[in-house]
């Protein structure tokens, strides 16, 4: 025991202990935030739908997403209309802030306008989501949580 007290009395030993604990603690905190991948929402395509199921050019439609809400985080949503067969983007809407108030009742509802120059036929709605759920994801955008919603198909009529 006296050897330990003598060792602790040496300044260089205390400095080495401090220099070992500090970087390890920082690495643990940064590692925890870097591996934080829990999505704010899980989207259930089989229970989701578009109202009305058939629309026309210029018409407003509402997508009703059945979701499981896990957490609330700031982020952005890039909504897209795509060809359900090829995945080609037919229309892209301006990025918008992610909804931080929705999903508590199990539903997210988003209204969009069908573009005037869109072709008739089946079209799929999807969103590219980007969330920053902690400070590291805000400062290092490559670590942000990114994912696509499932595609919900509806019909555009002339």
Stretches with model-predicted labels:
Residues 133-158:
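Short beta-strand elements
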């Amino acid at each position: 025991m006296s050897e330990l007290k003598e060792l602790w009395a040496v300044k260089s030993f205390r400095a080495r202990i401090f220099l070992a604990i500090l970087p390890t603690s920082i690495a643990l905190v940064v590692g925890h935030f870097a591996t934080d991948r829990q999505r704010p929402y899980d989207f259930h395509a089989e229970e989701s739908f578009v109202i009305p199921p058939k629309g026309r050019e210029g018409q407003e439609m509402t997508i009703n997403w059945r979701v499981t809400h896990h957490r609330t985080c700031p982020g952005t949503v890039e909504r897209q209309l795509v060809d359900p067969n090829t995945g080609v983007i037919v229309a892209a809407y301006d990025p918008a802030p992610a909804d931080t108030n929705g999903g508590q009742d199990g539903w997210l509802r988003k209204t969009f306008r069908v573009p005037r120059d869109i072709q008739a036929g089946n079209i799929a709605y999807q969103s590219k989501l980007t969330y920053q759920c902690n400070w590291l994801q805000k400062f290092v955008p490559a670590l942000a949580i990114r994912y696509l919603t499932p595609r919900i198909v509806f019909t555009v009529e002339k």
